[in-house]
Amino acid sequence: MKIVLLGAGGMGELALKDLVSSRVKQIVIADYDKGKAESLAKAYKTREVQISAEFVDANDRASLTKVMQGANVVASAIGPFSEYGVKVLKAAIEARVDFVDICDDPQPTIDELNLHNEAKQADITAIIGMGNNPGVGNLCAKYGAQKLDEVEEIKLIWVHPAISRTGGAATLHAIGAFSGDVPSYRQGHWVDVPAGSDKEVIEFPEPVGKVEVFHSGHPEPLTIPRYISVKDVSCKGGIVPVWAGQEFIRFLSYGLGDTEPIKVRGVPVVPREFTVSLLESLIHRVGKDMIGGEQLTKVSRVIVKGKKDGKATSYTYDRIGNDWEAGIALAIGAQMVASGAITEKGVFPPEGCIEPQEFFEELKKRGLRISERMTTEHAL
């Protein structure tokens, strides 16, 4: 089995670590910064696993297709996906190589899904959004829906620490997620709602506790209704500590996430680009001091509501802990495709081609467990 891993950043390293632990025979890690890729290859190489490093320019189709040649599957962690999602998938289609990525932006998700027929004609399997959120959360939604006779509502909730190991791409994604209008699904129709609106306080088990979440720009409301018959799908996100999330939402409400340039002393400046640079500088300078040494924990929840045997029933799935990272799910998805466990051809979100129970078994092997709670309404 040969897997080409694109991106030597935080998510790429996590995916590489899992691939090595799984003893994938041959791994090529490719990045624009070849030195960074070489460092990872050296750090993780073992007797059982052959790892090599290559240069790749994600803005150059020829560079992408060249590095993809001979792979069983390409796993892409190159972000932001608003810029590189479609570019990399088109290269995989041209190279006729199976593909998995962790695209977590709404519009690129639609653009990638629109390549379904091209991927099918190229006889490849492409799974997009195969991370934590989206990704594992989508499969939790599918798993809960399979247990109900009728699905009425699916709520997806994610909460991330203010400081991320993935750096600039994560900052840019968070700004996009809480800026402008974002997709939701209500009463069987796709609608746009204001990002950062409809605050909800969710209580998680300790050490997380109560967290504020808001409508956020994620692909789940766009993909889940295509495969699950449901009336409402929403995705809300939050940032911990709570005060940091509040300030972040307020910050963006002033237009600092906008993409239209404004003049600053006669020089055009894009507010969103300025904000990314400002936040990265702030985190670099004050870092852990900003959160007062507080231990921050990542958490996700999926709630699936409907009816079972005529009774109102809901299933709640929680994932708690900083081990839940997109890179691990990306590696699992890539191995499932490479091993032939997934045979559908075309472009799919995870819920479109993966059986949840099979994926959850892979998570268990890695010590990652999802808690499930069922609530049923009973008449007294």
List the predicted regions and their residue ranges:
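ADP-ribose/adenylate-binding Rossmann-like module
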Residues: 80, 89-109
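N-terminal Rossmann-fold NAD(P) dinucleotide-binding loop
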Residues: 12-13
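C-terminal catalytic/substrate-binding lobe primarily of soluble NAD(P)-dependent oxidoreductases
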Residues: 147-380
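Rossmann-fold cofactor-recognition segment
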Residues: 46-60
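Conserved N-terminal Rossmann-fold NAD(P)-binding element of oxidoreductases
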Residues: 3-7
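Helix N-cap at the beta1-alpha1 junction of Rossmann-like dinucleotide-binding domains, i.e.
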Residues: 33-36
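Rossmann-fold NAD(P)-binding glycine/threonine-rich loop
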Residues: 102-125
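Conserved Rossmann-fold cofactor-binding substructure of NAD(P)-dependent oxidoreductases
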Residues: 56-71, 77-80
